Amino acid sequence: METLNLFVRSIFIDNMVFAFFFGMCSYIAVSKSVKTAMGLGAAVIFVMAMTVPLNYLLNEYVLAPNALVEGVDLSFLTFIVFIAVIASFVQLVEMVVEKFSPSLYNQLGIFLPLIAVNCAIMGGSLFMQQKVVAGEIDSLFQSIVYGLGSGLGWAIAIVMMAAIRERLQYSHIPAGLKGPGIAFIITGLMGIAFMIFSGIQL
């Protein structure tokens, strides 16, 4: 039940976009089309589902104080190691997408490799580390669940935004609010709507 609660919280309550406003650059830029948003969302789910558990293992058995050698604390390498792991998986995703879906690769453009520095993905690993200290994550399986849930939450957010923005193309929006302006307002409203999930315990 704790694992299910962790999964639900990572999607709805601790949503990377609506709760922390992480990954906003690609969220705003790529959310103009549902198809493109789904492609980037799938890439983010994969990268987070892979990197969070891998970073969990590195944190537990290499970086944590006394993990590798008694009396040695390598936690100062956390950011470098986490970013290296994330960048490696993003490179793998980029090669796969370019090989099997050139059209999606061209639509995503620079934002696909930019997943490597997407603060939502880095945030997932850092929040995982925080939850390990707090005792909310205490196994590899729970880290996989958290990574998958966090990625799914971000993907749901960008697909919802893309669906709304596709409809907005046929609406009369004041000139000053067109583009990112209205997108930020809608994101704020959706964030408020997602607050209804706060306090849910399974």
Say what each PLM segment does.
Residues 36-46, 77-82, 104-115, 176-182:
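Cytoplasmic-side transmembrane-helix entry/capping segments in multi-pass membrane proteins
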Residues 22-36, 90-104, 161-172:
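C-terminal ends of transmembrane helices
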Residues 22-26, 44-50, 83-92, 117-124, ...:
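Hydrophobic core segments of alpha-helical transmembrane domains in multi-pass membrane transport
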Residues 5-46:
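Juxtamembrane transmembrane-helix termini in multi-pass membrane transport proteins
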Residues 5-19, 72-86, 144-157:
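Structural signature of hydrophobic alpha-helical transmembrane segments
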